[in-house]
C-alpha cells in the first residue's frame, strides 16, 4: 500500500514523502508542468521510474531528475521503500524565513 505525506511550509517548493509498503506498489503515471523542476530522492529501498521510452532504477541515496511534461511512474523494487519528491516552480518567490527566538 502506497502512503503519501505532503511536506508543509516550504514556500514555492512542494514535496511529498511516499512510502511503498510492499515491493510492486506503484505511484501512478503523472507529469509535471512545463515551468517546474522535479527531483526525487530515494530515501530507502529501491525504486524503478519509467515512461514510454525509458526506465531507470534508483537505490537509497540517489537523486533522480525529471524533465517537465514527461509522464512517468514509480514502482517499488523492495519492501519498505521511501522516496521524497520535490517540485519547484520557476519564477516562484523564495521561501520566507522567520527567525525564532529561543
Residue positions per predicted region:
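Short, surface-exposed charged micro-motifs
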Residues: 17, 39, 63, 73
Amino acid at each position: 500500500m502506497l502512503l503519501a505525506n505532503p511536506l508543509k511550509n516550504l514556500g514555492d517548493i512542494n514535496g511529498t514523502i511516499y512510502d511503498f509498503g510492499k515491493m510492486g506498489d506503484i505511484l501512478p503515471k503523472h507529469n509535471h508542468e512545463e515551468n517546474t523542476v522535479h527531483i526525487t530522492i530515494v530515501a530507502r529501498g529501491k525504486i524503478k521510474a519509467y515512461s514510454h521510452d525509458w526506465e531507470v532504477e534508483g537505490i537509497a541515496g540517489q537523486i533522480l531528475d525529471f524533465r517537465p511534461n514527461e509522464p512517468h511512474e514509480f514502482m517499488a523494487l523492495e519492501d519498505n521503500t521511501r522516496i521524497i519528491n520535490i517540485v519547484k516552480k520557476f519564477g516562484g518567490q523564495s521561501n520566507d524565513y522567520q527567525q525564532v527566538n529561543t
